[in-house]
Amino acid sequence: MIPQFKNRFEKLGFDELSPIQSAVYEPLKNGDSVLGLAPTGSGKTLGFVVPVLERIAPGQGIQAIIVAPSQELAMQLTHVTRSFATLVDLKVTSITGGANVKRQLEQLKKHPEIVVGTPGRILNLIEDHKLKPHDVQTVIVDEADDLLEGETFDAVRTILQNVPSEVQMGFFSATETPILTELEKWFGTPVTRIDVRDIDHTQGEVRHGLLEVGNLKKAGMLGKLTSVKQFKALVFFNHVGSLQQTKSWLMHHHVPVATLSANQRQT
């Protein structure tokens, strides 16, 4: 790792690379295509950002594209990538759906070396000849299990068909779906599989449990679980009505709760 990045790592409080960061560094730095499998929160983002940036030369066009499944994740990736890229005089631009196209086109005119974005918007700008991919040497597909299905799968494939044939590919995911076992078949390039899920305990050992609870008793069970010391939870619902009923029950019993749903006002 170059000194600038090593110093940034140390300032962020990291004493050593995580298993996924260590395992993918050399293959990515050498230009190999990889599938990186690691638990959520294990440092996958820096695992690909650092070696990819070390291969890029300033002022020689867009050399890396990082594809994310959502605008929110793309913005997070942009922030992380930019925090390292600025150390070596590289520019990063975010290209996402739902954002102002004219502003994005203005950013592309500043000749960034790295583009981070969502597949639909990236593909649209390539097809409109606004984003020129002929210098791209690396394409990273983050949350690959999510992106490589449905319409986004087709968009990712088309993006890769528009970049040079010798492009390096990186696919990263916390879970391995069937499509991730057939990457060479779909993308025509040998991909080295790197799986550290069994050895990476960065976030501690995850224990799974199952409780069979009737629908009418689920809110009460949540209330009981809150008696566990330092209990925090994300609870997913199939219907907004059930979400609101459970929220009302918990609030009535003085349990702190917040909700997020698609029909809430966005700010």
State each model region's role:
Residues 1-37:
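Conserved pre-motif I regulatory segment
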Residues 2, 60-127, 135-138, 256-259:
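Conserved nucleic-acid-binding Ia/Ib motif block in the N-terminal RecA-like helicase ATPase lobe
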Residues 22-34, 44-59, 80-84:
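Walker A/P-loop NTP-binding motif
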Residues 38-42:
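The conserved Walker
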Residues 124, 132-199:
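Post-DEXD/H (motif II) to motif III coupling segment of the RecA-like Helicase ATP-binding lobe
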Residues 204-249:
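Conserved interdomain hinge at the start of the Helicase C-terminal
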